[in-house]
Amino acid sequence: MPNIFKAIKFYFAAPKPLPPGNYAYQAAPDAPFPYRLHLRIEADGSGVLILNGSTVLHLNQTAAEYAYHLIKGNPAEHVGWQIATRYKTSRVKGQRDYGAFTEQLRTLIDTPDLDPVTYLGFDRQTPYTAISAPYRLDCALTYRLPEGVDTAIAPTERVKRELSADEWKKIIDKSWQVGIPHLIFTGGEPTLRDDLLDILAYAETNGQVTGLLTNGLRLADSAYFEQLVRTGLDHVMVVLNPDLEQSWRVLEVICPDDLFTAVHLTITPQNKAETPSLIKRLADMKANALSLSISDPSLAADLENARELAANLGLSLVWDLPVPYSSSNPVSLEIAAGEYAEELKTEGAGKAWLYVEPDGDVLPAQGTNKVLGNLLTDPWESIWKQPH
């Protein structure tokens, strides 16, 4: 009789997660699944999959196992048997679900302007657990600002120097070695660095997903924009100055391209009346997503109206990107846009993402004063073990 109870306990027990670690797959050009995959499996069985170096997929335990089998090249029949054994389901269903998973990956690859961060199997609001490394590293390449902009907007007094391109490459390599799949390059104005293209291209050689946060004005130069795209840049967010026609011309250049484009808009007392028309104009230009902030708490109702309008127009809302210091987004005035945004930043800061200043110092998030260490000179373990 005890053996029966033991068997029942085994039948209903949750399957033990696969071994945590990093796994890679690079198919031959003529392979049936000719893609590049990097998978990070966490101790709880969930995973992060980088698809073709351009999209980060957050996976629940079952989806992470499917990705593991795909990377290992296991036949569908074997996968079906493994899933059936581990999850007490039929072999046919396990094989069918595995086929549906691989087909979903193919669909994502073929989707234009795909969101660079996608969730399979659970909600974006899933709390951050004891992950082995952040999902994203926000790299402020410089705190310099365009000529004519008040330098007091950016915290230039915090840093004594900017890292060189070679030093940033060492940081990029260190981030890749610990399994960080997503790099954001921000500022200040990152396009003021002449070596930006070199830094972006280097991250692409690792297969990391890269994003650029900028005022965008230099992107109005179509030749420069094409160079950025050729480096492998995966997404861009433009901090919009709605009163500057050149800012709109930038969007006319980049929105038609097959590049996920988000736009940040700060709602102020001066532009709140025209905010609905601004958002409609962005939707008409085929921007993919919208980031919002307000310059004063009294604008909370305007923010909520803007959120609803954006959703109705099909614009995704982005809350967790570190908006560059700029005249259109003075840090002293920016306020988190809504309760969900504040919760997201609180939950994710120092866990899902870290912020690296121009000299390599690491902060839990943009705008915080706690230095966890220096990513160029300190061991990763000493930084990650710091209380965040």
Model-derived segments and their meaning:
Residues 333-347:
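Short, basic/aromatic recognition patches
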Residues 136, 154, 165-186, 193-302:
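Radical SAM/AdoMet-radical enzyme domain recognition
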